[in-house]
Amino acid sequence: MVAGFRSWWENIRKPRDAVLITLLVVLITLFVVILLGYTFHWDWTGLSQKTLWDWLQLLIIPVVLAVGGYLFIYTASRNEQRATEQRAQSERDAAEKRAQTERDIALDNQRETALQSYIDKLAELLLHEKLRESKPEDEVRKIGRVRTLTVLPRLDNERKKSVLQFLHESGLIDIGMSIIDLDGADLSKAHLRVANLYRADLRGADLSEAYLSWAKLGGADLGGANLRRANLGRANLSETHLNRADLSEGDLSKANLSKANLSGAILGGANLSEADLSRANLSGAILSGANLSEADLGGADLSEADLGGADLSGADLGGASLSGAIVTPEQLNRAISLQDAIMPDWSKHP
C-alpha cells in the first residue's frame, strides 16, 4: 500500500498532473460550497441570491486560467521531452557513426596488413625459395597458391587488383608458364578497370561482378572462369580464351572479342551490343536472350550455338557459320548482312 501511495505521489508531482489535480480540487470545493449554501440557506454566504449566470461568470475566469495554464505546461513539457529525445537520438547517431568509422578504419588496417604480409611472403618465396624456377610438383608452389587463395577473400575490391597485378608483373600467372594456379580464386567484384592482364592465366577464377571495363586481356586464358555479371565494356579480349566461361548477364558492349575462343561459353542475357566478334569461335555457345545488336559477327563460328531470343538487329553476320544454330528466320532478317553466311540448314546465303 505504501508503495502504491508513493507511486501515486510521484505521478502527481509532474507539472501537468499537478495543475490538473489542483483544478479539479478547486472546482469540487466550489461545487460543494455552492451546494451546501443552497441546501442549508447560508444567507451569510450570499449564495442563495446568486443565479446560474452569476456562478458561470464567477467561475469562467479561474477555469479558463487553469485550463490555459494546464495546456501551456503540457505543451512545454511535451516540447522539452521531444527535444530531449532528439538530443539523445542525435548523440546515439553520432556515437554509432564514430564507432562505425573506427570499425572501418580498423578493418581497412587489417586488410592493408594482410596485403603487405602476403606480398612480403611471396617476395620471400621468389627470392629465397626460387618460386619462379620451381616445378609443378614442388611444395613451394603449393604454398604460394594456398597463400594467394587464403588472402583474397580477406581483401577489398581494390586490394584484390593489387594482388593480381603483383602476380602478373612478377611473371607468376603467365600463359604457358603459370606458377600460381588461380583456379577458384576469389576475385569477385574486383576493381580491375583498365588493368593490364595481357596473356594472364586466369582459368577457373571467380571474377563474377568484377569491374573489367577497358581492361587489357588480349591473349589471356579465362577458360572456365566465372564472369557472371562482370563489366567488360570496351575491354580488349582479342584472341582471348573464354571457352566454357560463364559470361551470363555480363556487359561486353563495344568489347573487342575478335578471334576470341568462346566455344561452349554461357552468354545468356549478356550485352554484346556493338561488340567486335569477327572471326570469333562461338560454337556451342549459349547466347539465348543476348543483346547482339550492331555487333560484328563477320566470319564468326556460331555452329550449334543457341541464339534463342537473341537480338540480332543491325548485326553483321557476313561469312558467319550458323550451321545447326538455334535461331529463327525472323531474328536473322534483322541482321544487316548475311552475305556468304552458312545458314542453320547448312545452306549458303547468297
Kindly give the residue locations of the regions a language model identified:
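Intrinsic low-complexity/IDR segments
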Residues: 1-350
